[in-house]
């Protein structure tokens, strides 16, 4: 179990509300990452665990209950916590979403490095048996009206519902991630990125240099659509890669041509850390999503024979 040496204060905009958000990350002697909504009376602690991930209309990871105390878009912050090895903290927040900052994990990591970490490495969750979740299986579990809306949206956008996320045993002591995106937009097309993390300084430095700065992305027209419906109000060209309507370019400059899929590595790492530890295994994500990441963890933990837990 590891925590920060002292408290950290971070402020920024919520990507959906557009409002200023303040978080205070406090060191903790209890295992686990917990959020506390200081803007709500009797919020209590909200566990950042896979079994506390709630439903959301937005493409992010949300913990808690949407109708009550919840925190959304935690994945970039969780990825940064994972990378510095902190699995024990209480995060006080004065709103329903974490600050988007620059749309990546880099700014969180910079703040964490200023403070330092004390304690042991997080426990290892070793994948023993393969588990897989397919998008088609998820769709079957949704209400008919929701399925019809998604079917229509996918048909309009020319997307096939053939995505999956798979966890399988690894031959090494790493979390090996292979992420693949397939978009009809020419600027993205088909992109694959592979990354293996093994809790060493070299691996950490590689992440900071080659992945941490990758930003979230979306179409400019989609951005305007969301704003009209009270969402995406904090999105701007400083924190989101904005694709033009033709899909053959972006309104802001890319850091790497495959920045899109590199960002999916951040999302996957953040979601895997809701396991409560360092997942040792191979994670393959083909046209994956936050929902599939969460469901594959639920499937993993549904049977004790699927995994081992090793304390550091």
Q: Residue spans of the language-model regions?
A:
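C-terminal regulatory domains involved in ligand/effector binding and gene-expression control
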Residues: 1-87, 92-312
């Amino acid at each position: 179990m590891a925590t920060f040496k002292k408290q950290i204060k971070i402020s920024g905009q919520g990507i959906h509300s557009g409002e200023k958000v303040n978080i205070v990350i406090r060191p903790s002697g209890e295992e686990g990452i917990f959020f506390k909504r200081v803007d709500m009376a009797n919020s209590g602690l909200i566990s950042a665990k896979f079994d506390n991930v709630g439903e959301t209309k937005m493409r992010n990871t949300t913990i808690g209950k949407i109708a009550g105390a919840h925190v959304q878009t935690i994945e970039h912050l969780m990825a940064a916590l994972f990378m510095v090895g902190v699995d024990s903290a209480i995060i006080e927040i004065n709103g329903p979403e974490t600050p988007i900052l620059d749309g990546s994990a880099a700014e969180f990591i910079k703040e964490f490095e200023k403070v330092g970490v004390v304690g042991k490495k997080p426990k290892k969750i070793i994948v023993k048996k393969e588990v897989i979740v397919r998008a088609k299986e998820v769709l079957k579990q949704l209400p008919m009206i929701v399925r019809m809306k998604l079917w229509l949206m996918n048909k309009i956008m020319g997307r096939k519902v053939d995505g999956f996320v798979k966890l399988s045993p690894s031959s090494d002591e790493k979390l090996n991630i292979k992420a693949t995106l397939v978009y009809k937009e020419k600027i993205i097309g088909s992109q694959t990125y592979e990354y293996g993390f093994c809790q060493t300084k070299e691996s950490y430095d590689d992440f900071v240099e080659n992945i941490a700065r990758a930003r979230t992305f979306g179409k400019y027209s989609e951005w305007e659509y969301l704003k009209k419906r009270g969402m995406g109000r904090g999105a701007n060209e400083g924190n989101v890669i904005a694709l033009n309507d033709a899909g053959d370019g972006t309104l802001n400059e890319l850091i790497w041509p495959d920045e899109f899929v590199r960002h999916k590595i951040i999302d996957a790492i953040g979601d895997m850390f809701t396991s409560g530890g360092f997942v040792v295994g191979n994670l393959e994500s083909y046209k994956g999503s936050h929902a599939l990441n969460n469901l594959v963890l639920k499937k993993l933990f549904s049977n004790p024979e699927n995994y081992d837990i090793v304390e550091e």
